[in-house]
Amino acid sequence: MNRTISKLLSPALALGFLLGIHEGRVALWRDGEARPEQIYDIRADTLPPADRLQLSRGIRAESREKVWLLLENYFD
């Protein structure tokens, strides 16, 4: 896990989930986990720059439903 995600993971624990980038792909971390729970087949370099920036900073989600809503944007 890169340092940016490590720094973002602790504050995200209260919210439950964090979407970010792991080894060039969109990934999902669950609270308390050092490794991604799921790595999606979405290459970060294929996303628009604004999306890549958001993911590199980490996108917090309080529920799995919110995660799926966020992911729908990247699968389109």
Q: Predicted regions span which residues?
A:
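The feature represents the first ordered module of a protein
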Residues: 1-36
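C-terminal partner/receptor-binding element of secreted or periplasmic proteins
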Residues: 51-76
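Glutamate identity and glutamate-enriched acidic tracts
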Residues: 23, 33, 37, 62-65, ...
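Flexible, solvent-exposed short loops/turns enriched in glycine
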Residues: 26-56
